[in-house]
Amino acid sequence: MQTTETYLGLLRERGKKGLPLQRVYRQLFNPHLYLTAYGKLYRNAGAMTRGITSETVDAMSTEKIKAIITVLRTEQYQWKPAKRVYILKRNGKKRPLGMPVWSDKLLAEVIRMILTAYYDCQFSDHSHGFREERGCHTALQEIYSTWKGCTWIIEGDISD
């Protein structure tokens, strides 16, 4: 069984070379990926939030990982519905928020790690949204370092 970093490194290399992904579903049987995903998720404030079941990060164990892998091997895994709650926004309106059960969060993080390792190197370097170590600050930094100003400004009204 390959370690997480070894496998994700191989995926990055395949992504850089444009080689196709192969046997990805089988990698969902790798317990090292789940332990790494757990390490990324357990620090989040929402890790202790319950979904439709009482399952939280506290219930995590290697036995739980083995149980998830066993169900995946038999292709019987069923995603559970997310608990829908509404949280208040600053303007007084409410925003819906889906709270999945812990095992779904964990499996989704494993899948995200695999897909990110393969596809992230294929994305544009100018894309900053929803990517690791990128965001609005890196976008602003890129604008600051590359924008040279403008020579012309055209203002007008186009009508029929």
Show which residues each predicted segment covers.
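Non-catalytic, polymerase-adjacent accessory regions of viral genome-replication enzymes
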Residues: 1-66
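Sequence-level motif detector for i,i+2 pairs with an aromatic at +2
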Residues: 6, 36, 82, 94, ...
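Residues at alpha-helix boundaries and the short loops/turns that link adjacent helices
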Residues: 18, 31, 105, 117-118
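Active-site-proximal segment of RNA-dependent polymerases
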Residues: 26, 115-160
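Short, charged low-complexity intrinsically disordered segments located at boundaries
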Residues: 36-42, 55, 64-73, 96-102, ...
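Reverse-transcriptase-like RNA-dependent polymerase core
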Residues: 41, 70-93, 106-114, 141-149
